[in-house]
Amino acid sequence: MSSGDLVLKWAWPNPEDLRNAELTSTRESGEFETPPADTIFVTYFFRFNHHTGRFEEAGRLDWYPSSERAGSVYFGERQVQMNALHRKNKPTSRSRRFKSNKGNEYKWKKGSDAGMQELDFVCVDSWRRVVGRWSNESQTLTMTSGGFAIFDELVVTLWLQIWRREKGFW
């Protein structure tokens, strides 16, 4: 870890419902919030705005009512299908790929495939440079400077990896 890295500590107020999470660090903070309702299948993600002193909506996940796997993710106005943020390159692949807003490809790999613990994840760019590391033990995402440009995408795709792993369909 370098001094320029950003470390986000994740906390789940209710560990039984991973759709609600709080992220904190000394520089940035955010949260995922799913309103408790039977008919609404939306998870919002917020980022703290240091200029206004408030959390502001950065996007949302619209879940299909019959599925915990599929839906649409909105990064501001840009819509992406959830499955596009969790693509396998080939049927036997143990990593999951996604494209950033700028068209660059990234992939999340299981920690055991990157010399880390089984429940950890590491995200690399197309040049195999690490842009983020998830430590399940400490519940932290360490983002390198290479991940700052895709902050929202990195946080949301990690959240989806954790969600899918816990639901048994990573």
Q: Which residue stretches match the model-derived regions?
A:
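Helix-adjacent hinge/juxtasegments
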Residues: 56-92
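Low-complexity or membrane-interfacial segments used for flexible interactions
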Residues: 1-32, 36-46, 92-96, 101-170
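A beta-rich soluble binding module of mature secreted/lumenal proteins
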Residues: 38-51, 55-60
